[in-house]
Amino acid sequence: MFKHIMFPVDLHLPPEVRKAAEVAAQVARWQGARITIVSVTSNQPADLTQTESAIHDRLSDLADELSQASGAPVDFRNIHSVDVAAEVDGDLARTAEEIGADLIVIGTHAPRITDFILSSHAGYLAKHASMSVFVVR
């Protein structure tokens, strides 16, 4: 049913990401799917809190953990953005199409008052992505 799972992550690894990682691993194991981890980071010099090498290492470590948990091949991709807050939703939706994902597994927080005005990232993907989206709370 699912062959390629896209797993968007916040590199600060809040609890929602860890829980969603468990779900992505279980679905990949059950479906025999591969996983691509996707992160969006800023390319503005004032916003660079981590080096490219540190980002690569963090994604590589997460990919190794996810591969061990799922038994599936796991790749990763970091997208550079001028304005992460404004562009992350579109970047994730485009990347899902580009890599041929047929499922997005994404963690989210409990709804806040602002989510009724501006959708969460998971809410945006659930509404706009052309593939299935599994939102993990």
Language model segments and positions:
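Short, flexible loop segments at boundaries between secondary-structure elements
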Residues: M131-R137
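Short secondary-structure boundary segments
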Residues: S39, G107-H109, R137
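Glycine-rich, Arg-bearing micro-motifs that act as flexible, cationic patches
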Residues: L103-H128
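Small/aliphatic-rich secondary-structure junction motif
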Residues: F2-Q50, Q68-V74
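Structural beta-alpha unit
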Residues: Q68-I104, P111-R112
